[in-house]
């Protein structure tokens, strides 16, 4: 079964995790019909700072502006299977937990949750404060999965 996947890269540090995810998606391209990507302005800056390049532009994915509410996955009728926010900043997590759909990332996350599809949040900002942990609980209760990563 070919999947349709949304990847959002927020402005949290950890651009290397987004790059690894992009590379893995290329590796399994025969199993993926579409990959739609949203990068926040901060994500673009962090990528350039941490990785020293802007090579995210070279990946053969469909890129969308952070404010493009006409992107297909801004609606449940597009039937994207999975959304991965990698890395997921605590600000993005908080907006999703609060139901605030103020950009394409948070709108798509809202759609994925209401359609009972898979939302994976790759939290990066550790240690967590109490508000962030409560936001994680809220999104998990709504059906999302939280995945913490650390560098080796």
What residue ranges belong to the model's regions?
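A cross-family phosphate/adenosyl-ligand binding-site feature
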Residues: 1-120, 126-152
